[in-house]
From Swiss-Prot:
Its main location: nucleus. Belongs to the RNase PH family. This is Putative exosome complex exonuclease RRP42. One of its GO terms (molecular function) is mRNA 3'-UTR AU-rich region binding. Keywords: Cytoplasm, Exosome, Nucleus, RNA-binding, rRNA processing. SUPFAM superfamilies: Ribonuclease PH domain 2-like (SSF55666), Ribosomal protein S5 domain 2-like (SSF54211). It comes from Dictyostelium discoideum. InterPro entries: ExoRNase_PH_dom1 (IPR001247), ExoRNase_PH_dom2 (IPR015847), ExoRNase_PH_dom2_sf (IPR036345), Exosome_comp_Rrp42_subfam (IPR050590), PNPase/RNase_PH_dom_sf (IPR027408), Ribosomal_Su5_D2-typ_SF (IPR020568). The gene is exosc7. Gene3D superfamilies: GHMP Kinase, N-terminal domain.
Length: 324
């Protein structure tokens, strides 16, 4: 475990108390971050985020999952909230703490934090597959093409696809769904790791493209799938209400955002708040050994709302520029 000397710790605490941190920022200043998408060619979506020296790479892979018919509607609805499967792996080269078995606990903790962030009902409800925007000429051609394909498929069986319907990620309602495996790799760490992870995951989901699938029911009720090989014939994800995390760390009597690795070594307590673009709170998790009084918690949450919306606006602007 990394350590910091008493003199270094005192220097950082006094700087935070005087609103002048060791890197020149004030208590609520966020470091600049960079986003790159489409980094992993064979993934359905990917993104790389660099927050100072903290660097995270996320890839998204889509697979068809069969839901057993005997599952009740309540269990099925609950299972729908698990259409996203998260896995985090911290590279040993990113930090001495990640060497050997040092990263095992952190990998599990970060993965579960992402699961909690995305388990909010409003996140799953609004994270839908949407149709791509097609020009009028192409749309007419596609309608002709689909009509011709439909006549051919009538001879083989009934087309029962409902991709992109109101049931999140559904291919055949109640039977087959898309499951998205979101795998993250921590390439380097200089503090505020989970915030960087949440930014990278949201960016990767925005970059995700899922091929259109037709589910065809045969004569004996068996279902086969026809996956479009047209790279333009895809579905994308609506991420408008997908949150990111803002972590607020208490050092001494004050709290700061976007901590460096050295600042984290001086931490008394922290609060990680999931915020979406509407400034709604999607998750809250406390860490650290010290307690937090209600007044401080309210101040932290209000700060997280303001900072979170600001970061999301920057993200959406950056992702729009990348897409264009």
């Amino acid at each position: 475990m990394q350590k910091i000397s008493p003199s270094e710790s005192l220097f950082i605490q006094q700087g935070v108390e005087n609103n002048i941190r060791s890197d020149g920022r004030n208590r609520v200043d966020y470091r600049n971050f960079a986003i790159e998408t489409g980094e992993i060619i064979h993934a359905n979506g990917s993104a790389r985020v660099k927050l100072s020296q903290t660097e995270v790479l996320v890839g998204v892979k889509a697979e068809i999952t069969h839901i057993q018919s005997e599952i009740t509607s309540n269990l099925q609805q609950s299972d729908t909230s698990k259409r996203l499967v998260f896995s985090v792996n911290c590279c040993p080269s990113a930090s001495p703490e990640f060497e050997g078995k040092g990263s095992e606990f952190l990998n599990i903790e970060l993965s579960k934090q992402l699961e909690r962030l995305y388990s909010h009902p409003n996140v799953i409800k609004n994270l839908k597959l949407t149709n791509p925007i097609i020009s009028n000429n192409n749309n007419n051609n596609n309608k002709i093409k689909e009509a011709e394909e439909g006549k051919e498929k009538e001879k083989e069986g009934d087309i029962i696809t409902n991709s992109g319907d109101d049931n999140c990620f559904s291919i055949v309602s109640g039977k087959y769904y898309w499951t998205l495996y979101v795998d993250a790799i921590v390439l380097d760490s200089d503090g505020n790791l989970f915030d960087a992870l949440s930014i990278a995951c949201r960016s990767a989901l925005q970059n995700t493209r899922i091929p259109r699938v037709k589910a065809i029911q045969g004569e004996y009720e068996e279902i086969t799938f026809e996956v479009s090989d047209d790279p333009e014939d895809t579905l994308s994800l609506s991420i408008d209400n997908v949150p990111i995390c803002v972590t607020l760390t208490k050092i001494g009597n004050q709290f700061v955002i976007d901590t460096t690795l050295q600042e984290e070594l001086c931490m008394n307590a922290r609060l990680t708040v999931g915020v979406n673009s509407l400034a709604n709170i999607c998750s809250i998790q406390k860490g650290g050994i010290d307690g937090l009084d209600p007044t401080t918690i309210n101040q932290m949450i209000n700060t997280a709302k303001v900072v979170g919306v600001k970061i999301l606006n920057i993200m959406d602007k950056t992702l729009k520029e990348i897409s264009n």
